[in-house]
C-alpha cells in the first residue's frame, strides 16, 4: 500500500466518523461520542502508524531498488563507456598507425627527394668546380702563351741584337786578323833583321840568337797577354756591372729587414725555485712525461728562477715552452695534465704556423698559395741558416726579386712568388731525405706552382744552368740577402777555420809574401814580392787565387781578392 492510499483511507475514516456522529448524535450521548471519537482516533493512529511503518518499509525498499537500479545503470554506463573508450582507443590507434605509416612514407619520399636534391647539388657543384678549374687552366694557358710570346719576342730581339754584335765582332776580328797578319809580317822581317844584325855584331850562333829572341818575345807576349786579360776583364766588368749595379742599388735601398739568430736553448722563467720540485714531480715522473711527449730536454740546474729547454728542433722547443708556461700558470702539474696541455700546445702551434705563413705571403705580396704550401711556409719561421731566419730571408728575397724584375720589365708578382718559395724545401728537410732544392722542387710541383717558380727553386744556387730569367733574379736576390753584413753568422770555430783557409790558399802561391783575411772573411789582401811578381802577373795571380777559393771552399756571399804590389826604392845621402 502506498502513502497516498493511506492518506485517502484516513480521510474516509474521518469523514465516516463525522457522519456517524451526526447520525447518532441525537440518540447517543456526548460521552459515547467522545469514546467513539477516541476509539476512531486510536484506530486512526494505529492505522497511521502502520501506514507509516509500511511507508518506511516501502521507502526503504524503494531506496534499495533505486540503489540497485543506480548501480545497474552505473555498471551499464561504465561498460558502455569502457566499450566506447575501447572503440575510441582502437580507432585512435588505427588512426595513429595510419598517420605514422603515412608520415613514414612521406619521410621516405622526402628523404629520397633530399638525396636526389643533394646528389643534384653535388653534381652541380662538381660541374661548377670543373668549370672553374677549366677556366683557371685556360686562363693559365693563355697567360703562359702570353708570357711565352713575350719571351720569344724578347729572345728574338736579343738574337737580332746578338747577330748584329756578332757581325760587328766578325768584322772586327777580320780587321784584327789583317792587323795581326801585318804585325806578324813586320815581326818576321824585324826578326830576320835582328837575326842578321846579331850574326854580324855579336857573332852569335843561330841557336843562341833564336833563344835570345824567343825569351824577349815571351816576355813581350806575357806582358801583352796580361794587359789584354786585364783590359777584357775591365770591359766586362764595366759593361756587365753598369746596369746591374744600378738595379741592385735601387733594390737594396728599397729593402731593409731585420735578421734573427736562432739558438738551440730556450730559457723559461718560473715564479720561484720551489716550483722546480713540482716540475720534476715524484721520482721524476713529471719531467719524464714532459720530455717523452715533447721530445725536448728539460734542464733544471742552479740557474735562479729559470729552467732551460734544449732541442735542435725549434718547433718542438716552442711547443714545449708554450706547454710549460701553461702548466706554470695553471699550477696543476701531473702526467695526465701534461699530456693534455702538450696536445693543446701542438694544436695552437699548427694555427700559429699557418698564421705566420699567411702573414709572410701578405708581406711579400704573393696571393693564391695553397693552404698546404702556406703551412710549409710558416714552418720556415722556426728554421735558420747561418743564424739568419729563413722565413724573413725568403720575404726579403721576394722583395728584392720583385724590385729587380720590375726594373727589367718582367712579371714582378711571379718573381716575388719564386723568391718567397725558393727555400721552401728547408721546411721539411729534417724529416724528408734529400737536399732542400730537391725537396722544394717536389713540393712546388705537387702544389701546382708555375714552371718559373720550379726553375727558380731548382737553380737558385747555380743560375748558369737556369732556363728562365726568374731563377737568375732569385739567385741574385738570395746572394744579396745572405751577403749583407750581419745577415748571417757562423760558429766561432768555423769562422776561424775559414779565415785560416783563406790565408793558407793565398800563401800557397809562389811570390806571395804574406796574406790577410779581413772584412770578416769577405776580403783577402795579398802582399806579393815585387821582384818576383810584376804588375801584369798581379792581375793573373788575383784571378788564380779567386778561382782556387771558389773550388776549395764553401762560404756565404762572395770573397774579394786584392793583390798589393809595392816597389820601394831606398837610397841614402851621405
Curated annotation (Swiss-Prot):
Q: Which residues belong to any copy of the KH domain?
A: 264-327
Cell compartments where the protein resides: Cell membrane
Q: Name one GO biological process term.
A: mRNA catabolic process
State the Gene3D superfamilies in the record. Answer: 1.20.5.2950, Hypothetical protein af1432 (1.10.3210.10), K Homology domain, type 1 (3.30.1370.10)
Top-level division of the source organism's lineage: Bacteria
Q: Where are the transmembrane segments?
A: 1-21
Q: What is this protein called?
A: Ribonuclease Y
Query: Which family is this sequence assigned to?
Result: Belongs to the RNase Y family.
- Cellular component annotations (GO), alphabetically ordered: plasma membrane
The protein's topology relative to the membrane is: Single-pass membrane protein
Question: What is this protein's gene name?
Answer: rny
The record's annotation in InterPro entries points to: HD/PDEase_dom, HD_domain, HDIG_dom, KH_dom, KH_dom_type_1, KH_dom_type_1_sf, Ribonuclease_Y, RNase_Y_N
Q: Which GO terms describe its molecular function?
A: RNA binding; RNA endonuclease activity
What PROSITE patterns does UniProt report for this protein, alphabetically? Answer: HD, KH_TYPE_1
The record places domain HD at 390-483
Taking the first listed entry, what is the main subcellular location of this protein, grouped into a coarse class? membrane
Q: Which UniProt keywords apply?
A: Cell membrane, Endonuclease, Hydrolase, Membrane, Nuclease, RNA-binding, Transmembrane, Transmembrane helix
